């Protein structure tokens, strides 16, 4: 395992004497993988409604991005709001948090899961967040399913040509290994959000209604001195991510 993950597991193993942690540092139950207190039942339901056993299994890992998202944001509600000032200087306050929100991407195909969604349920703003923790340590080649070339699977026929042009341009420049799975997920989420913005689909039973909508990636930046190898891979992914939008 990479050094950063090993450090996390060492800390978790300190709790091995308790019945909720296995010898390998993973939790027996994802509901125990929280920084403090107990996981609220409504959030447990959100995780169980995600991708079933696969998601629950991954959420037992101490380096789970999904649980990192939960631990960072679960406290947000109408009494405890989060205000963010964005790069465009706009200040938005969020008073609701949702986890593992399903977003339709291709018609009849598996939906994408958005790790975290922040909302202001009074004024209508949305912030979609894809949580990354240590995923960028994984290397591989860029590959999208052939389904993305099938015009009949898109909610609007003209989507197919637009997205395949983007996919082809990335495929042509992705000869080196890197965390390309992150770019693949980015494309899936952007297709899904485009479907919603064009009112082809609903998200959480809601149709887009001209609200302020934003999408960000949350990535943990390792300490350069303590985790040099991981930091280098983080900077590699940062360059790769920004090149996607060039």
Residues covered by each model-derived region:
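Extended hydrophobic secondary-structure segments that form protein cores and membrane-embedded regions
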Residues: 213-221
């Amino acid at each position: 395992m990479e050094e950063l993950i090993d450090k996390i597991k060492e800390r978790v193993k300190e709790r091995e004497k308790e019945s909720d942690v296995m010898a390998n540092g993973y939790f027996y139950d994802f509901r125990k993988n929280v920084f403090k207190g107990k996981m609220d039942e409504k959030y447990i339901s959100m995780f169980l409604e995600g991708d079933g056993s696969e998601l629950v299994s991954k959420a037992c890992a101490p380096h789970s991005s999904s649980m990192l998202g939960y631990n960072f944001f679960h406290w947000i509600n109408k009494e405890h709001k989060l205000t963010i000032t964005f790069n465009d200087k706009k200040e938005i306050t969020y008073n609701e948090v949702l986890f593992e929100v399903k977003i339709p991407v291709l018609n009849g195909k598996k939906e994408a899961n958005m790790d975290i969604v922040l909302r202001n349920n009074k004024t209508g703003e949305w912030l979609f967040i894809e949580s990354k923790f240590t995923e960028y340590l994984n290397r591989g080649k860029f590959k999208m399913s052939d389904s993305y070339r099938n015009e009949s699977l898109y909610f609007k026929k003209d989507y197919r040509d637009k997205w395949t042009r983007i996919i082809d341009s990335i495929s042509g420049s992705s000869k080196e290994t890197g965390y390309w799975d992150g770019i693949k997920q980015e494309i899936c989420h952007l297709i899904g959000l485009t479907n919603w913005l064009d009112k082809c689909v609903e998200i959480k039973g809601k149709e887009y209604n001209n609200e302020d909508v934003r999408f960000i990636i949350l990535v943990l930046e390792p300490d350069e001195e303590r985790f040099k190898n991981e930091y280098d891979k983080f900077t590699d992914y940062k360059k790769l991510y920004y090149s996607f939008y060039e």
